[in-house]
Amino acid sequence: MKVSFCIPTYNRVKFIEDLLESINNQSSHSLIVEVCISDNASTDGTEESINIWRDRFNFPILYQRHNENIGPDRNYLSAVNMGTGDYCWIFGSDDILTKNSLALME
């Protein structure tokens, strides 16, 4: 089973790394994970950080940066539309996945 973590963001680079760490640190599960980040024209270096994190984490990170702010509702839809998983789990960019959450999903 594949799970898409759909994350809309805007100028939250300081928080996204903690969220990605919490996803990466999940254990005892056999789920396929992808992360889909829709960036609402951030100006805080989010795109540069995403490029570094792609090499660091054990799951694909799909990233789309909008050239202008499209509003929160369209940014959420953009993140969801990127996902290819059987399930979509929408996370705020400042959320943290609790330990063993993916194992409990199975």
Where are these regions (language model features)?
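Nucleotide-sugar donor-binding/catalytic module of glycosyltransferases
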Residues: 1-106
